[in-house]
Design a protein with these regions (language model features):
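Nucleotidyltransferase catalytic core that binds NTPs
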Residues: 1-144
Length: 144
């Protein structure tokens, strides 16, 4: 009988996707099937003031990654992915290098549903989507 793979959730804005995201997803895929919880365009606009790439574009890129089983849009009106985690109830919620136990509001949801939390998946913080966009603005590349 084939052993069922663990369901591993990762989350983020992925706007734009960068090498740190690639490494996090690759590391998560070694643990099981990856479900990417991708923040919504309205969430990005509330957090950063803009959406560099649409959810549809980010989703298409993320679905192309090896090991990604699905990409779902976060129900993130409250600023978290708690509602989405409660719905999918993965085995593991894997967090990248910019998330820590003291800045992750999803901890209580994970405890409630017995979702294991992992930190530093894919290594430490390597790059910032916001910094990439700021650098592009500095060299004169404009969005839209």
């Amino acid at each position: 009988m084939k052993k069922k793979k663990k369901l591993i959730a990762v989350s983020g804005g992925f706007d734009p996707v960068h090498v740190g995201h690639v490494r996090m997803i690759q590391a998560a895929a070694k643990l099981g099937d990856v479900i990417v919880i991708c923040n919504s365009d309205p969430w990005l606009k509330r957090k950063k003031g803009y959406s560099f790439m649409s959810f549809r574009e980010r989703s298409e890129i993320l679905k192309a990654f090896k090991g990604v089983k699905d990409v779902i849009e976060a129900k993130d009106d409250d600023g978290t992915v708690c509602e989405t985690l409660a719905e999918i109830q993965p085995d593991v919620f894997a967090n990248g290098g910019d998330r820590y136990s003291d800045n992750t509001p999803e901890i209580q949801t994970c405890k409630k549903y017995a979702i294991e939390m992992l930190w530093g998946v894919g290594g430490g913080k390597i790059q910032s989507s916001s910094d990439l966009v700021a650098n592009m603005k500095q060299v004169g590349i404009k969005n839209g």
